[in-house]
Amino acid sequence: MYDVAIIGAGVVGSAIARELSKYQVNACVIEREEDVCNGTSKANSAIIHGGFDATPGTLKAKLNVRGNFLMDELARDLDIPFKRNGSLVVCTKDQDRSGLEKLLEKGTANGVPDLRIIEREELIAMEPNLSDDVTCALFAPTGGIVCPFHMTMAFAENACTNGVKFFLNTQVDTIEKNGDSYRISTLHTDTKNKETFEAKVVINAAGVYADVFNNMVSENKLHITARKGEYCLLDKDAGTHVSHTIFQLPSKMGKGVLVTPTVHGNLLVGPTAVDVDDKEAVNTTASGLDSLAATAARSVKNVPMRQVITSFAGLRAHEDSNDFVIGEVKDAKGFINAAGIESPGLSSAPAIAEMVTDIVKGLLPLEKNPDFVGTRKGILRPDTLSLEERNKLIKEHPE
């Protein structure tokens, strides 16, 4: 029997696994896909948000700011590509400046440091390609960009190093209370073999399917809506078109279409925001991609959309409460939700991991792992090495 079983190996599930591995705990992660980071975590804006948009007092606000704070140390220890490039929320001539002032108030209440509103003259010096209609912007210097793939893999690999077991190609079919534990029935999607797991504590980090698993064990039903966002990724030749992450004023559907550099030197434009019934609907559409160019032009001019090298879509897990749903389920002792993790979920993942681990510590007698290894060497990319460095590597590893 496992002490803890985590459902879902996205960035949240993997971050929780890594945080739990700091303790002497028999834990596993169950993931239906063939690798980690194959759901929501693989198709998003790759942004570490400052934390100014979330409503003060919500979990989104608290955990975004905390997660942002943790990123420098995590990037160093786990070798995660991360850069604090800063973000700008721009206001145009036909918009009300009061929207920026409200964001500034919210961000200040949330504890976001160094926020300020800057005027067009300073803005254009920072970002020459901003639209001619942009009049001012909220500047958040703590905003950043990250690689969600490397971030998730870093958490998962470090968790594995410290003893957490990952079961991939393993689809959860049912979860049942079994005395003081839970019985998790699964199907191995590659072999079609069935396997049953027993765990004292179950952590539900299943993205758009988190409501399905919650509703198997609880009368307190959740409803997760899959909110599709389409993106265009541009060639590295376009990667310097902007240097900051450029947001538009947010709406009830999200933070709007952004234009941002990536940590790999490309330019990313997106997302759209359309609620869909199909939780597997990650297809792109002509109308969605066409709308990106028009909408992005409101904040950034001359975005070189002819240099698009690929397009993709991802699904955000929107819960009806409009906040993260994190905590032990009242009528299902030992079942912990990490549900409704939409934006700013990537930014908040390290802090969500801390919060969930604290909940587990209230359910199980956890002791520190004296052998915990807190660092990890990232994936080597030969294309980033000099000729001398590549030759040295070849000599060291001729195989």
Please identify what each model-predicted range represents.
Residues 254, 263-264, 280-399:
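C-terminal catalytic lobe of FAD-dependent flavoproteins
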Residues 12, 35, 209:
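Conserved Rossmann-like nucleotide-cofactor binding loop
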Residues 46-126, 135, 256-257:
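Dinucleotide-binding Rossmann-like beta1-alpha1 core, especially the glycine-rich loop
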